[in-house]
Swiss-Prot record:
Pfam families: TGT. Its cofactor is Zn(2+). GO terms for biological process: queuosine biosynthetic process; tRNA wobble guanine modification; tRNA-guanine transglycosylation. The gene is tgt. This is Queuine tRNA-ribosyltransferase. Residues 253-259, 277-281 are annotated as: RNA binding. Zn(2+) binds at C310, C312, C315, H354. Coiled coil: none annotated. Belongs to the queuine tRNA-ribosyltransferase family. Substrate binds at D92, S93, G94, G95, F96, D146, Q195, G222. Keywords: Glycosyltransferase, Metal-binding, Queuosine biosynthesis, Transferase, tRNA processing, Zinc. Binds 1 zinc ion per subunit.
């Protein structure tokens, strides 16, 4: 089940404010979706995700199929019961992970033959198998199996002919995914994925074919796969706003805070990316005034929080805690620097909470700006503040 309502639009861009109703709850859009690859957003309790405003999270079809396996998932009634998350979940199709295996896989019209990265077993993923796995996971949004068109093929930029071959296979797999999804009687929502590499004419062909299939929602895939930023932005400016206005639009695997705000301006409703969690574990933190490298020696004695304007547990602490010097109960940059240098577990937990809070709060501010008819002003202010530097 999926219902999508447009609540407001921006007159200076393609941005829109929406409300997405799914089987496990309502999602206010535009939204960022934290990535929970193995059934967990790394280092963060489900309760903390809810507290920071997460409305929908991702699960990884491929990895959950590998471990713990479908028998375990079925015994819990799906992914929600397994990971104790009562809000909506989106699962990818497994196509990107299979594509990432490189020489360990062979793609044919029927599907993908590959060796399990866990134990080396020979396995097969097809559109039908992907739909069966995602039906067992009982995710609210299911993604068609597609072939992620790479930016480079055999050491050269993917040619238009190579991108066409890949896009047309994804289009045929979309038909098979939809047929199997309907045969299984899956009560959730299936999204089609626009492919075509960096070629706008192929993107348009893919888009038109998928729209004819009448999916409940659509995604733009095959971006942020190694291409230069200007080419990614070019596709982002071309494709999303051409998708049906009355259906949700999802930009897969993107990206930086700047990418999210520009994506919203191009008509995107949904985003996911591992960047906030991965960067947190590697010591890069996002703030209102730019990115901060907590490993830099200059933070060794810094008493400031990561971001004085942030209300996450890392920056503001827990309610009711303060210090005699008037400071808040949050953690200093010096303390987070110390945890990182010592390899303490608490370090990446706190930085992950901060980065996710930043992303989710950014989308909340975007929604509020759209509600107020002020998205253009917000967009300009956001750019200026991020460019200022920490």
């Amino acid at each position: 089940m999926l219902k999508f309502e447009i609540l407001a639009t921006d007159t200076s861009s393609h941005a829109r404010r929406g409300k997405l109703t799914l089987n496990h709850g309502v999602v206010q859009t535009p939204i960022f979706m934290p990535v929970g690859t193995y059934g967990t957003v790394k280092g963060v309790m489900p309760r903390s995700l809810r507290e920071m405003g997460a409305q929908i999270i991702l699960g990884n079809t491929f990895h959950l199929w590998m471990r713990p396996g479908l028998d375990v998932m079925q015994s819990f009634g799906g992914l929600h019961g397994f990971e104790q998350w009562d809000k909506p979940i989106l699962t990818d199709s497994g196509g990107f992970q299979v594509w990432s295996l490189g020489s360990m896989r062979k793609i044919t019209e029927e599907g993908v033959h590959f060796a399990s990265p866990v134990n080396g077993d020979k396995l097969f993923m097809s559109p039908e198998v992907s739909m069966q796995i995602q039906t067992t996971l009982n995710s609210d949004i299911v993604m068609q199996l597609d072939e992620c068109t790479p930016y480079e093929t055999n050491g050269h930029k993917t040619t238009e002919a190579e991108a066409r071959k890949s896009m047309e296979m994804s289009r045929r797999w979309a038909v098979r995914s939809k047929n199997e999804f309907e045969r299984l009687g899956n009560p959730n929502a299936l999204f089609g994925i626009v492919q075509g590499g960096m070629y706008k004419n192929l993107r348009q062909e893919s888009l038109e074919a998928l729209v004819e299939m009448d999916f409940p929602g659509y995604a733009v895939g095959g971006v942020s796969v190694g291409e230069p930023k200007d080419e990614m932005l070019d596709i982002m400016a071309h494709t999303p706003h051409r998708l049906p206005a009355h259906k949700p639009r999802y930009l897969m695997g993107v990206g930086t805070p700047e990418d999210l705000v520009e994506g919203v301006a191009q008509g995107v409703d949904m985003f996911d990316c591992v960047m906030p969690t991965r960067n947190a574990r590697n010591g890069t933190l996002f703030t209102r005034y730019g990115d901060l490298k907590i490993r830099n020696a200059r933070h060794k004695t810094d008493h400031q929080p990561l971001d004085p304007s942030c209300t996450c547990h890392a920056c503001a602490g827990t309610e009711g805690v303060s210090w005699n010097d008037g400071g808040r109960g949050g953690f200093s940059r010096a303390y987070l620097h110390h945890l990182d240098r010592c390899g303490e577990m608490l370090g990446p937990m706190l930085t992950t909470i901060h980065n996710l809070h930043y992303y989710l709060n950014l989308m909340r501010e975007v929604r509020e700006a759209l509600d107020a008819g002020q998205f253009g002003a917000f967009r300009a202010r956001f750019k200026a503040e991020r460019a200022r530097g920490v």
